[in-house]
Amino acid sequence: MSNSIEQQQTPEVPPLKYGEREIAKGELFTFPNPRIGRHYQIHITLPEFTCKCPFSGYPDFATIYLTYVPNEKVVELKAIKLYINNYRDLYISHEEAVNQILDDFVAACDPLEVQIKGDYNPRGNVHTVIEVNYQKAN
């Protein structure tokens, strides 16, 4: 028997692809509202939202509808796409996902008003729609 210790080799993890790196950042970037003081709505539809059920691990699919009245900042569209894609591997309930999106959006954009609706694809004959709202205090 030899006194040398065998080293176990762990498989090398391949580097992230450029899209995976961008999604991992997932920050909500904003830019100045070009019409501060004007009350207008922005509607964003994100039809490819995915996350994982925290109980079963099965994937959940939804369309996220975001409608907001900007204050001083507007969300950059590519940034919200990448932010939403960051949920794809998270184990999170429908309710928590939509509420977390609202919290993060309000923190990044400080809108006057925002409504976020998660319309989840039916699974097991159950269709879930989660809707949350925020209105800035005067």
Swiss-Prot record:
Active site annotated at which positions?
C53 (thioimide intermediate), D60 (proton donor)
**Entry keyword set:** Cytoplasm, NADP, Oxidoreductase, Queuosine biosynthesis
Q: What is its EC number?
A: 1.7.1.13
Q: Known catalysed reaction(s)? A: 7-aminomethyl-7-carbaguanine + 2 NADP(+) = 7-cyano-7-deazaguanine + 2 NADPH + 3 H(+)
Q: Pathway membership of this protein?
A: tRNA modification; tRNA-queuosine biosynthesis
Q: Which PANTHER family match?
A: NADPH-DEPENDENT 7-CYANO-7-DEAZAGUANINE REDUCTASE
Matching entries from HAMAP family are given as: QueF_type1 (MF_00818)
The record's annotation in NCBIfam families points to:
QueF-II (TIGR03139)
Name of the molecule in the record: NADPH-dependent 7-cyano-7-deazaguanine reductase
Q: Which organism is it from?
A: Gloeothece citriformis (strain PCC 7424)
Taxonomic path: Bacteria, Bacillati, Cyanobacteriota, Cyanophyceae, Oscillatoriophycideae
What gene is behind this protein? queF
